[in-house]
């Protein structure tokens, strides 16, 4: 059994840091550049997130060895020549003073788009691939740099059979209490994480379904999960020695 578990984790999941998702920029660019069967799905995902563009083109850069820094290790030079960088361009409409479309302008996504748009682009490849293959995707800090409604939309893609026919799984961490909604997540999908003590580096995981409230009951399905969490009913919140008054007091 242990060998099967290890093999599953080795072959199935992808792991992404929501704060350092640039590592997956190349992944998305390469799929767009080489996999025509993925391109439409990735562009549909990007377009559905209301980022302001629908089309993306890619271009593989030419590596001139003479332009590389002197003394660069030979293995790095060889890697750059074998896998030259790919640049992705978002096609934006050019609008005149009368609000009319008068042309198209290309934006280098890495250079000219916002942090949130770049993150969505970087996540697009792994998300589409995960949904197509029925794999598991781990994203740390999913909500970082994203509007709350965009984070929720990504979660919904995994919640419905229409968009997730192969049973792919999204496992993510977040500090956004907007995610704690009965309209988005069931109780058995939520786990709270907290340090066991101020001086301890260990972490305690508490599934919402295992929590017992002060009245001896379990969290109700019609509860306001986010409000109850911030009120400390589920634990896993910071505690302060002093407290500031609310602005309306």
Regions found by a protein language model. Give the residues of each.
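Phosphate-coordinating catalytic segments in nucleotide- and nucleic-acid-processing enzymes
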Residues: 1-124, 225-228, 239-249
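Walker B catalytic acidic pair
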Residues: 140-142
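Catalytic core segments in nucleotide and nucleic-acid processing enzymes
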Residues: 116-117, 148, 154
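Contiguous, well-ordered alpha-helical segments that form the cores/surfaces of helical PPI scaffolds
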Residues: 121-128, 156-157
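Conserved D-loop-proximal element of ABC-family nucleotide-binding domains
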Residues: 132, 144-148
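Short basic/glycine-enriched coil/helix segment immediately N-terminal to the Walker B
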Residues: 127-135
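C-terminal lobe/lid and adjacent interdomain/linker elements of RecA-like ASCE P-loop ATPase modules
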Residues: 153-249
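Short, contiguous acidic/charged loop-to-helix segments that flank catalytic cores in large enzymes
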Residues: 109-112, 145, 161, 180
